[in-house]
Regions:
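Short alpha-helix
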Residues: 207-231
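Conserved SAM-binding loop of SAM-dependent methyltransferases across substrates and taxa
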Residues: 79-90
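ATP-binding glycine-rich loop module of kinase domains
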Residues: 313-350
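N-terminal auxiliary segments of SAM/dcSAM-dependent transferases
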Residues: 1-32
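A short glycine-rich, Lys/Arg-flanked "PGG" loop and its adjoining helix->strand segment in the class I
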Residues: 152-170
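Conserved structural core of kinase catalytic domains
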Residues: 363-420
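Catalytic activation segment of kinase domains across protein kinase-like and atypical kinase folds
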Residues: 202, 425-488
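Conserved class I S-adenosyl-L-methionine
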Residues: 172-195
Length: 554
């Protein structure tokens, strides 16, 4: 049973009453017997309800290799969004939360944990004699100075909490970047509520918090006495990460295919960050404009987590949620986020073996300790190559799709029977070759192109008795979606006609929507997904309004 200690709590800590939204979150936690709120967040559209209760918060560190048997101090537990994750990975967790009501609901949310102790109160008032392997300071440092720009305040705080670390212990910090790309694009500042408020060093009254540039945060960490640190760049931000890069692994190619930004309020946007990442990467500027920073800090030890990149699919649930990590030793590992994902992990291994037996090139994988392990390969993906070649040589672009389609046809034996569960199945249509097993991830983003050969990887999903043309449809659909000017060089209509997809495209769109909506849990996350949509016309209007305002001032 989780223990809650309140003797160090001072009533003035709760001078700010909980909002109605926070009171509702407390009620939701009290009524829920398990830490699973998918149904609830599908029904309640409020942002803070989603943020405090979604499992997606765990993506910040569910890929991180905590040392076995370790102890962790969480400072600022909030409503316990990350507390359960820490309990899963560490032998003992102590969570400190300044609000008594929040502390009570951390206890309620994780009441069945046997390795969790919760303190209500300010960390400076609590005489915890224990020292820890890890201290987690997630989204709290910005508030320590109550909006002050004085770096000494933040350095002193980091130095004081560092006294609770064991020798060789690690402080883990997650903060906003003042120069984050979404804020450069016009998103409201998180602590002022006004676009560009901290970027232009405005004279607005102090905000509720203060965010940092990378150099500013580096100086604060160094002045606190931490001699060693490692920066990670969670994208789109630290609250709901999908990709986590590091200083030792900066993207070299487009992020559009794997990253979906979101906005709490998109009404003030002047640009869309996903449109800018290609230029950011080409100009080596990601470390300056990443929306958030995640930092490991140590006073005297450089033995940091050996993960240099992580891609997480926490949104896909317990059976299909994975962390794919690149390690400093040159290995790539694919790890199920929950034990329920082990069967799917074995399926992926089987898929690779079957494709290899069909004389196709695949990245060789081994199943070790409930992980898939494979070598890191520095080749370009076919997707990246297609983006280049369509502009230089459209004929080669077409030939590459011929090559891909031939590989799809080669991947499995053929059957005469179409799967009747195919969404929108119409027996009057000619679907072409039906594969006994259709490996639907045989698309350019999951394929390397090297020495004129296709080398497939991460072949996760298989559909039995599906059309080969459906796999090709997926390859074309996403290629044209992510190469926005592809139509200038060769039209999608021409490609559809070449492969006999004209009469099938609409039916395949129905099947694809059905697959993606189930895979990405649209029903559960539809309120969040609304925040990923942007109004491009609205951005143009915003830009024109700025121009008109400038002319009036002249």
């Amino acid at each position: 049973m989780t223990l809650l200690i309140t003797q160090y709590y001072k009533s003035e800590n709760d001078e700010v009453e909980l909002s109605q939204e926070e009171m509702d979150i407390c009620s939701y936690i009290s009524q829920n017997n398990e830490d699973n709120y998918d149904q609830l967040i599908s029904e309640d559209p409020r942002w803070n309800v989603f943020l405090q209760l979604t499992r997606l918060r765990k993506s910040l560190l569910n890929w991180y290799d905590f040392k076995p048997g370790s102890t962790l101090l969480e400072i600022g537990g909030g409503f316990g969004a990350l507390t359960g994750l820490f309990c899963d990975h560490c032998a003992e967790v102590v969570s400190v939360e300044g609000s008594l009501q929040r502390a009570k609901h951390i206890q309620e949310r994780h009441k069945n944990r046997t390795n969790l102790k919760i303190y209500a109160g300010n960390i400076g008032d609590i005489p915890i004699d224990q020292k820890f392997d890890y201290i987690a300071l997630i989204g709290l440092l910005e508030f320590e100075g109550k909006g002050s720009k004085d770096r000494l305040i933040y350095s002193d705080f980091l130095k004081s909490i560092g006294e609770r670390l064991k020798p060789g212990g690690k402080l883990i910090i997650a903060v906003e970047n003042r120069f984050g790309l979404k804020y450069l694009c016009g998103a409201p500042d998180p602590y002022y509520g006004i676009p560009f408020a901290q970027i232009n060093q405005s004279s607005y009254k102090k905000g509720t918090g203060h965010s940092f540039s990378k150099q500013e945060l580096t100086t604060i960490i160094e002045n606190a006495g931490y001699k060693h640190f490692k920066f990670y760049y969670p994208l789109p931000d630290y609250r709901l990460p999908q990709l986590i890069y590091s200083e030792k692994c900066i993207p070299k190619t487009s992020l559009k295919e794997r990253l979906t930004p979101y906005y709490i309020d998109s009404s003030s946007l002047l640009a869309y960050e996903n449109d800018l990442y290609d230029d950011v990467i080409e100009n080596n500027a990601l470390e300056f404009v990443a929306n958030s920073f995640l930092v490991e800090c140590s006073f005297n030890d450089m033995d940091f987590c050996d993960v240099i990149y992580a891609a997480v699919s926490t949104d896909r649930g317990r059976r299909e949620g994975f962390a794919t990590t690149i390690h400093s030793d040159g290995n790539v590992k694919k790890t199920p986020l929950y034990s329920e994902g082990l069967p799917q992990l074995r399926n992926i291994k089987e898929n690779h073996d079957e494709l290899e037996s069909s004389q196709l090139k695949v990245i060789r994988t081994l199943l070790k300790e409930n992980r898939l392990v494979m070598p890191y390969v520095a080749y370009d993906t076919l997707s990246d190559y297609l983006k280049i070649i369509i502009r230089k040589n459209p004929e080669e672009f077409v030939l590459l799709f011929d090559q891909l389609y031939n590989s799809i046809l080669q991947s499995s034996s053929i059957t005469e029977h179409m799967n009747p569960s195919f969404h929108g199945y119409n027996d009057s249509l000619d679907y072409g070759v039906i594969l006994e097993k259709a490996y639907i991830d045989m698309i350019p983003v999951n394929c390397f192109y090297h020495d004129k050969e296709l080398i497939f990887f991460d072949q996760e999903f298989v559909k039995e008795q599906y059309p080969a043309k459906y796999v090709l449809f997926r390859a074309l659909k996403y290629t044209y979606f992510f190469i926005q000017d592809a139509e200038r060089y060769i039209s999608l209509g021409d490609m559809q006609e070449r492969y006999g997809l004209n009469h099938l495209w609409e039916e395949f769109e129905k099947e694809e929507y059905n697959f993606v909506s189930l895979n990405r849990k649209y029903n559960e996350y539809h309120n969040f997904l609304k925040r990923t949509y942007i109004d491009r016309n609205g951005m143009r209007v915003n830009a024109k309004q700025l121009l008109r305002a400038n002319r009036k001032n002249d």
